Each structure stands twice: as C-alpha cells, then as structure tokens.
Amino acid sequence: MAGGPRRGGRRRKKVCYFTANGITHIDYKDTELLKRFISERGKILPRRVTGTSAKYQRMLTTAIKRARHMALLPYVKDEN
C-alpha cells in the first residue's frame, strides 16, 4: 500500500473570513487584507486552503487582479 495507513481525525470546517467579519465589499486598495490570501510566491490561494466562500473568492480574485494591474501588488515575488 502506497502512502501508509490513514489516520482518522475530524477536521474543523473552515469558516469564510468575510462572512464571519461581516465584510460585504472587498476593496482592491486594501493590500494588507489581500496579502492574507496570496501565497509567499504571489499566487492566489485556493478556497480549500483559505475556507473562503465561492462568492467572496470571486470578489477576492477580481480585487487581487485589479491591485496587480494598478501595481499595488506584485504578480510574482522573488525567490530570494
């Protein structure tokens, strides 16, 4: 068997950050908020990692892309 035995454990359900905090609009100028949802390499983190709902993931993606276009966020980050 590849991978070894499976461990039984219940994972805690991830809660959407925006729903929990009552945020209805994601502003592309709020770079500190957007940086929470970007990997150290500059990629947008997926929903399964962050727990963001589909509605807010779409808004988040649009805001990050706008911030990148306006040079508020980098497209990629250096290795060093």
Swiss-Prot record:
GO terms for biological process: translation. It comes from the Bacteria. GO terms for molecular function: small ribosomal subunit rRNA binding; structural constituent of ribosome. Transmembrane segments: none annotated. The keyword Ribosomal protein applies. Keywords: Ribonucleoprotein, Ribosomal protein, RNA-binding, rRNA-binding. One of its GO terms (cellular component) is cytosolic small ribosomal subunit. The keyword Hydrolase does not apply. HAMAP family: Ribosomal_bS18. Belongs to the bacterial ribosomal protein bS18 family. Part of the 30S ribosomal subunit. Forms a tight heterodimer with protein bS6. Binds as a heterodimer with protein bS6 to the central domain of the 16S rRNA, where it helps stabilize the platform of the 30S subunit. This is Small ribosomal subunit protein bS18.
